Regions:
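Solvent-exposed, non-transmembrane regions of membrane-associated and secreted proteins
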Residues: 1-251
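Selective detector of the "anchor" transmembrane alpha-helix that sits immediately C-terminal
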Residues: 249-263
């Protein structure tokens, strides 16, 4: 009986860990967002204006230089623009809100392992998310990590859905314009598109595997309307949806726990 009890407790801990970790990460994310909002309200205009100018210069140079060195997010490249140099307390630069995914998360500069374990990240050698012509900020997130959803439900997004990026200067609305599946090596598929103001969401695909990338292209709201809902890319690959795998993972532990309790 003692052994059975120990096995039951071990199984229960294993079952509960993802939910506990998800609660912890989401709670920390909520605090980071609240801290971000406070800093935004209390911003030093001289420092913030200088930072904005430096970021614009960075984005312009990135476009002119052709984004040399861009690579897959899961190589965990470190950040190449440090906002701590401008008297900021942390690397939270913005927040992202995706109603269709019931997601609100802080956005960190640099797709490091640490940053990707606690939020959404800006891929190195892509535009900083401040908007503007000739920009494409590639925002990377795990397809679920240790119980935290992150971009797990990205397949819920459809063309026409709204995504909001809130940085220190403005709130920018983007509209999903196209969805593609690409290979990790196809970095040319996430480059800046001439004349466009974009963000691109990227995560692993299929779910629980990482040999492909699920990519959601989004253009700024006014551009989406002006262009007559035209897409930036044309997807060509037919792929299997991960929704069934996600559903099984979500409910199977409860079924197994119920069976364990009954028997």
């Amino acid at each position: 009986m003692v052994l059975v009890g120990i096995c039951f407790l071990a199984g229960l801990c294993y079952f509960l860990f993802p939910y506990f970790n998800s609660w912890m990460v989401n709670n920390d994310a909520k605090k980071e967002i609240e801290s971000f909002e406070v800093l935004k309200e209390e911003k030093n205009f001289d420092t913030h204006d200088l930072l904005f100018e430096m970021m614009e210069d960075y984005n312009n140079k990135l476009y002119k230089d052709g984004q040399n060195g861009i690579s897959d997010a899961w190589t965990f490249d470190q950040k190449d623009f440090v906002i701590g140099d401008y008297d900021f307390k942390n690397d939270v630069f913005a927040t992202i809100s995706i109603p269709k995914m019931n997601l609100e998360m802080p956005v960190y500069l640099g797709a490091s392992k640490e940053n990707m374990a606690k939020g959404i990240t800006v891929l190195a050698n892509t535009s900083l998310p401040i908007g503007g012509k000739n920009t494409n900020s590639v925002l990377a997130g795990h397809r679920g990590y240790r119980g935290v959803p992150f971009f797990r439900d990205i397949e819920n997004l459809q063309v026409g859905d709204e995504i909001t990026v809130n940085n220190y200067w403005q709130e920018i609305k983007y509209i999903v314009s196209d969805i593609q599946i690409i290979l990790p090596s196809e970095s040319e598929k996430i480059l800046i598109q001439e004349g466009k103001d974009m963000i691109t969401l990227i995560t692993c695909h299929p779910y629980r595997r990482n040999y492909q990338r699920y990519v959601v292209y989004c253009v700024r709201e006014d551009e989406y309307k002006k262009d007559g809902n035209s897409v930036v890319h044309q997807g060509s690959k037919v792929v299997k949806s991960s929704k069934n795998d996600i559903m099984i993972e979500r409910y199977l532990p409860f079924i197994l726990l119920l069976i364990l309790i009954i028997f």
